């Protein structure tokens, strides 16, 4: 998935972080995280550092304040640079840059990310799924609407195989479906996405596990599957702020060119420009790459 793209970027920026040269060896490459933030690096990646403020300064530079917890104890740090590209969740940007114009803040805050749940289910024996002759299941009106064998990544030096009698991982996903308030005709898709996020936060592990086992038993019980016996482990990845918001004709106005909220929100502000998929109102990696290209170009043309 996109993790491999990120790993390729990091290795290109900091060659000492991992061996190898291209996509064919990136999956198995062992990364040395101690190389990410060396003082003599041309490019530095600083983990465990949460930005809390970004501001244009009078000397034509940009200051970024962040909380550093890399040493165990939290400390406030401020760094300066000529330029800054904000590539984080758009709705948080007005809190990091309070000097932004009100109209731009509103544009940045308009979108509501889709909450998602990604689950990995380790089966003791994948042979039961093999009996069905199917590896991808769409399950409308079920608790989990997509179940499949985990997508395999195959590269030159990484070629996994599925063998009968051996463990198998199922990939399970859904978007928490809140019930629409029938007494509120003005309820929008953004309202529903927010309600879904709150539902996701309230759910315990058992709230995810119970309907999953019930659904898998219904789907595969005829092939001898018993969830209590055949499931070795379950991992639940809650993604409260998942996909970037896509406009929906049923709920959103039709804006003129350059007037959509994401277009207003991403306008350069001094020496600060804006990237990430939110700034394109498009959730996928090509949208994020387009945003990166645009934001860098905006800096170079200043």
Report each predicted region and the residues it spans.
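Structured loop/turn residues at beta-strand edges in well-structured enzyme cores
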Residues: 40, 49, 79, 229, ...
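Alpha-helical packing segments of well-folded alpha/beta enzyme cores
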Residues: 1, 5-9, 47-50, 92, ...
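A conserved beta-strand/loop element that lines the FAD pocket in flavoprotein oxidoreductases
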Residues: 18-25, 33-52
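Mid-domain catalytic core of redox enzymes
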Residues: 43, 47-182
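Conserved flavin/dinucleotide-binding core of flavoenzymes
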Residues: 122, 128-302
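C-terminal substrate/ligand-recognition segments
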Residues: 2, 13, 51, 168, ...
